[in-house]
């Protein structure tokens, strides 16, 4: 990745709220399936804004060293085909994770905050276009500079 796009908490909140507006009326949804881990943050905003309390997760590991995507590994999945659920992730990048999500939850509404060209067509809605060669630094990954997770120390 040659470029970086740094997202602040304020920016993230604003974009996630905009995504929430597009999902109204809230009464059409049974719940949210958050793609762990990046989708946990927008799921919290969507849940608050839409008044949704039923939150499930699907846990898929794809980024193995903060930079390169590796083979997908499903660690946990919410049951069902997604009918009446919003599936949310922070980003659709190459589309590898998105294709797996679509296979698991074909009847869900799949949304992300950010989308890169290679994966954008795989989600039903997103807020911000990001160039394919750009790495997104999400606010939960940052201190004043990148802070590695405690488990890696």
Curated annotation (Swiss-Prot):
Q: Where does guanine bind?
A: 93, 136
Question: What are the leading ranks of the lineage?
Answer: Bacteria, Pseudomonadati, Pseudomonadota, Gammaproteobacteria, Pasteurellales
Q: Entry's Gene3D superfamilies? A: 3.40.50.2020
Q: What is its EC number?
A: 2.4.2.-, 2.4.2.22
InterPro entries linked to this entry: PRibTrfase_dom, PRTase-like, Xanthine_Guanine_PRibTrfase
Q: What is this protein called?
A: Xanthine-guanine phosphoribosyltransferase
Taxonomy, superkingdom: Bacteria
Q: Where in the cell is it found?
A: Cell inner membrane
Question: Could you confirm whether the keyword Cell inner membrane appears in this record?
Answer: yes
Q: Which GO terms describe its cellular component?
A: cytosol; plasma membrane
Q: Which PANTHER family match?
A: XANTHINE PHOSPHORIBOSYLTRANSFERASE, XANTHINE-GUANINE PHOSPHORIBOSYLTRANSFERASE
Q: Which organism is it from?
A: Pasteurella multocida (strain Pm70)
Topological category with respect to the lipid bilayer: Peripheral membrane protein
Question: Which positions does UniProt annotate for Mg(2+) binding?
Answer: 90
């Amino acid at each position: 990745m040659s470029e970086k796009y740094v997202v602040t908490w304020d920016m993230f909140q604003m974009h996630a709220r905009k995504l929430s507006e597009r999902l109204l009326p809230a009464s059409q949804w049974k719940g949210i399936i958050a793609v762990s881990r990046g989708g946990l943050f927008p799921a919290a905003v969507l849940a608050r804004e839409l008044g949704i309390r039923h939150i499930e997760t699907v846990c898929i590991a794809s980024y193995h060293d903060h930079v390169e995507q590796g083979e997908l590994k499903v660690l946990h999945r919410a049951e069902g085909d997604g009918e009446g659920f919003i599936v949310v992730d922070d980003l659709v990048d190459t589309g590898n994770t998105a294709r797996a999500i679509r296979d698991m939850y074909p009847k869900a509404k799949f949304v992300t905050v950010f989308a890169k060209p290679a994966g954008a067509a795989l989600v039903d809605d997103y807020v911000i276009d990001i160039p394919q060669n750009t790495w997104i630094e999400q606010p939960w990954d940052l201190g004043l500079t990148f802070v590695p997770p405690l488990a890696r120390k």
